[in-house]
């Protein structure tokens, strides 16, 4: 083969190889582009059912990176379906309560910018717990804190922080409110926020960050609500509201709300005579509330709310060891399950209890006269037997040498059961501590445990002499 033929042969082979390589590169490029764009659409399932992903050509931001033969392929991951909460798991069986959180707001106020608050509570979304309180529109080390013993001013707002984070200057003000309730339906937060004139207040219903509905005062006498979490089952939330006398007959109504819109309002029925500041918890498929009778009884009213047909019944906790303050000595206190006991019914304090079969777990101040100290215990037969007084599993949360205040319940869904937790408001300043001109609080939080536990006392802990006046 002469030199010219060799050159032609080598050139032909090289051209053939180059052509094959070029075609392979085109094929690889086409495959890569096809895999990149041929992703999957996750259709919104009907009736909250999980549906398979259908193929569609679409760009998404949610991607998973897979390395295959040095080629980067992006494919969509179908997002998890968000469902309404139904609280259908059983209640956890507990032996008592263990410490969970404490925010130390008053101690921190001695040297930092912390909001003046009262009426705190705790509520959780499916992944995290938050603390709420009604702020007074001022920090503690601020002349505006003078006179914050007053409950209802137009500057009060509902504050919301992750549980354990004190209400610092960066805290979100969720709404304008001097009375409130909040709950998460599994998809978004609902906030019920009451503000305005005593004789003509407004309740705003804020869902997923938007004002959806409102209702005005129906008795022109301080429309007010729970000061703790509401409860949502299968997308419908319920909240208890009262308008009328704080020491006489009032008009209590139970509101049912769907994604912020009022869908039904029911009047209180049953034997409860006066309802204030209910502490509610899910008791699937219904909701149960333990409230404050500020008129006739130191035994606590119970409201049972049927979430399917909106029917309502009420009664009183059977335990003869009653939960309100002030109250009679335990040896002379009574409850017949149906009626107020007419024992030191006025004024009262917000509190909680929850049923456990025939028994009842409850918390109350240690003092029968003042908002000082705090204890929890179980009363055997306290849910079913009139005037039952057999107390077990008593724990001191705050010793009787320190101030307490309101308390309330919140529920946390675990893997196999629903746990009950509670918070205690630790009030400092006026009216008891007159060296200062302000009134504010910190909180301590406990949750039910099936384990063992020790003893202690968890007061606010601030030295009033270190505090701004």
Swiss-Prot record:
Subcellular compartments: Virion membrane; Host apical cell membrane
Topology of this chain in the membrane: Single-pass type II membrane protein
Post-translational modification (record): N-glycosylated.
Binding-site residues for substrate, renumbered to this chain: 118, 152, 276-277, 292, 371
Active site, UniProt feature: 151 (proton donor/acceptor), 406 (nucleophile)
GO biological process: carbohydrate metabolic process; viral budding from plasma membrane
GO cellular component, one term: host cell plasma membrane
Positions bound to Ca(2+): 293, 297, 324
Disulphide bond pairs: 92-417, 124-129, 183-230, 232-237, 278-291, 280-289, 318-337, 421-447
Region (Hypervariable stalk region): 36-88
Ranges per topology, Intravirion: 1-6
Virion surface side: 30-469
CDD domains: Influenza_NA (cd15483)
Record note on what altering residue 292 to K does: In strain: Isolate Oseltamivir resistant BO12.1-c1
Classification via InterPro entries: Glyco_hydro_34 (IPR001860), Sialidase_Influenza_A/B (IPR033654), Sialidase_sf (IPR036278)
Pfam families according to UniProt: Neur
More about this protein: The influenza A genome consist of 8 RNA segments. Genetic variation of hemagglutinin and/or neuraminidase genes results in the emergence of new influenza strains. The mechanism of variation can be the result of point mutations or the result of genetic reassortment between segments of two different strains.
Family affiliation: Belongs to the glycosyl hydrolase 34 family.
Cross-referenced HAMAP family: INFV_NRAM
Domain notes: Intact N-terminus is essential for virion morphogenesis. Possesses two apical sorting signals, one in the ectodomain, which is likely to be a glycan, and the other in the transmembrane domain. The transmembrane domain also plays a role in lipid raft association.
Protein name: Neuraminidase
Organism of this sequence: Influenza A virus (strain A/Japan/305/1957 H2N2)
Gene (name only): NA
């Amino acid at each position: 083969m002469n030199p010219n033929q060799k050159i032609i042969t080598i050139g032909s082979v090289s051209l053939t190889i180059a052509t094959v390589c070029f075609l392979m590169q085109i094929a690889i490029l086409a495959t890569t582009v096809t895999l990149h764009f041929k992703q999957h659409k996750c259709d919104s399932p009907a009736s909250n059912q999980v549906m398979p992903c259908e193929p569609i050509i679409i760009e998404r931001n949610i991607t998973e990176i897979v390395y295959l033969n040095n080629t980067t392929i992006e494919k969509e991951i179908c997002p998890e379906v968000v469902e309404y909460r139904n609280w259908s798991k059983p209640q956890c069986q507990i032996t008592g309560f263990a410490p969970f959180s404490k925010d130390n707001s008053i101690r921190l106020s001695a040297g930092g910018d912390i909001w003046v608050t009262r009426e705190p509570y705790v509520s959780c979304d499916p992944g995290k717990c938050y603390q709420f309180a009604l702020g007074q529109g001022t920090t503690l080390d601020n002349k505006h804190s003078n006179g914050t013993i007053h409950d209802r001013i137009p500057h009060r707002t509902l504050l919301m922080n992750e549980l354990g984070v004190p209400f610092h200057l960066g805290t979100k003000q969720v709404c304008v409110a001097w009375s409130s309730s909040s709950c998460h339906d599994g998809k978004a937060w609902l906030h019920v926020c009451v503000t305005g004139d005593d004789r003509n207040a407004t309740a705003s219903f804020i869902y997923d960050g938007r004002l959806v509905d409102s209702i005005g005062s129906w008795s022109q006498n301080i429309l007010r609500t729970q000061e703790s979490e509401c409860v949502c089952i299968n997308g419908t939330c319920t909240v208890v509201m009262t308008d009328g006398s704080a020491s006489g007959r009032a008009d209590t109504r139970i509101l049912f709300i769907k994604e912020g819109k009022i869908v039904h309002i029911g009047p209180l029925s049953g034997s409860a005579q006066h309802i204030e500041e209910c502490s509610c918890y899910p008791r699937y498929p219904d909701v149960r509330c333990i409230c404050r009778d500020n008129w006739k009884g130191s035994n606590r009213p119970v409201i049972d709310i049927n979430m399917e047909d909106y029917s309502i019944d009420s009664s009183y906790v059977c335990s003869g060891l009653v939960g309100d303050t002030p109250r009679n000595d335990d040896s002379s206190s009574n409850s017949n399950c149906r009626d107020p006991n007419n024992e030191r019914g006025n004024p009262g304090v917000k509190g909680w209890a929850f049923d456990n079969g025939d028994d009842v777990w409850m918390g109350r101040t240690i003092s029968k006269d003042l908002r000082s100290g705090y204890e929890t215990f179980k009363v055997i037969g306290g849910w079913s037997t009139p005037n039952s007084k057999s107390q077990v599993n008593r724990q001191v949360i705050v010793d009787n040498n320190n101030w307490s205040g309101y308390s309330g319940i919140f529920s946390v869904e675990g893997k196999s059961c629903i746990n009950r937790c509670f918070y205690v408001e630790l009030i400092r300043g006026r009216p008891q501590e007159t060296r200062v001109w302000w009134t504010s609080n910190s909180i301590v939080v406990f949750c039910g445990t099936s384990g063992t536990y020790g003893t202690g006392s968890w007061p606010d802990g601030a030295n009033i002499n270190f505090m701004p006046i």
